[in-house]
Amino acid sequence: MTHDYIVRGLAYGGEIRAYAAITTESVQEAQTRHYTWPTASAAMGRTMTATVMMGAMLKGNQKLTVTVDGKGPIGRIIADADAQGNVRAYVDHPQTHFPLNDQGKLDVRRAVGTDGSIQVVKDVGMKDYFSGASPIVSGELGDDFTYYYATSEQTPSSVGLGVLVNPDNSIKAAGGFIIQVMPGATDETVTKLEEAISQMQPVSKLIEQGLTPEGILNEILGEGNVQILNSTSAQFECNCSHEKFLNAIKGLGEAEIHSMIKEDHGAEAVCHFCGNKYQYSESELEDLLETMK
């Protein structure tokens, strides 16, 4: 099985910027950790795929967080990624599932809802943040990220996202693409791109056929039209730690920590993103109080 990775490329003489990713293993890791049911897995996996490709557009230590909140039964989907291909995600209600929709596909729109927004916060370093948001227009997510780029970042784009789930709830395949029109692109190039996208198979079909990220871009943009610039491995990775949660407990204040010691004789923290649990003993909390004096 091919490991997850993202490719970045140019097409049509540099007038098109393109990203594609296979994210099957990363989405599987998230599914296992959160025990998501199929519709939730598809929604979470599509969001992870978009987020990890958006991360590939960053540099150095920059990172971003994407929050999808369509006010649907799944609640919020939160994913973050960095420039190194690390991605993690969780959903408020992982056991969300519905019968297949009219097209015989997982009903992601029903789970996500259509009465909310996508918010993107980019940490670009030096305590500098870029924040953008756009309304959810479809709930299927690919169209919603396309709309986000057009309205919030003024970049005409096409975003395709697909997740296939096996009958046993495991992830069969996951992946997607982001194709963007660069400033100065000719009308001819834009027309060619629109035609190519209108004629392409759904992303889920491309990944089901076992296409690589390079194969996805070649399939959409045509063999020989794509110049691959680089590739980055992608993986589910959580940077939580015992120390980070201890700092978070410190932020609750002395009164709350005294209460933890007196009533609970310790504390437990659970990471939303990966499900890891961290235990803090009475003595550890008492030591923490000492450092706060």
Swiss-Prot record:
Highest taxon, organism lineage: Bacteria
GO cellular component: cytoplasm
Family matches, as InterPro entries: Heat_shock_Hsp33, Heat_shock_Hsp33_C, Heat_shock_Hsp33_N
Disulfide bond positions: 238-240, 271-274
Family matches, as CDD domains: Hsp33
One example GO MF annotation: protein folding chaperone
An annotated GO BP: protein refolding
SUPFAM superfamilies: Hsp33 domain, HSP33 redox switch-like
PTM section of the record: Under oxidizing conditions two disulfide bonds are formed involving the reactive cysteines. Under reducing conditions zinc is bound to the reactive cysteines and the protein is inactive.
The keyword Lipid metabolism appears for this protein: no
Xref: Pfam families: HSP33 (PF01430)
Cytoplasm listed as a keyword: yes
UniProt keyword annotations, A-Z: Chaperone, Cytoplasm, Disulfide bond, Redox-active center, Zinc
Compartments where found: Cytoplasm
Protein role: Redox regulated molecular chaperone. Protects both thermally unfolding and oxidatively damaged proteins from irreversible aggregation. Plays an important role in the bacterial defense system toward oxidative stress.
Entry-linked NCBIfam families: PRK00114.1 (NF001033)
Family: Belongs to the HSP33 family.
Protein name per UniProt: 33 kDa chaperonin
Organism this protein belongs to: Staphylococcus epidermidis (strain ATCC 35984 / DSM 28319 / BCRC 17069 / CCUG 31568 / BM 3577 / RP62A)
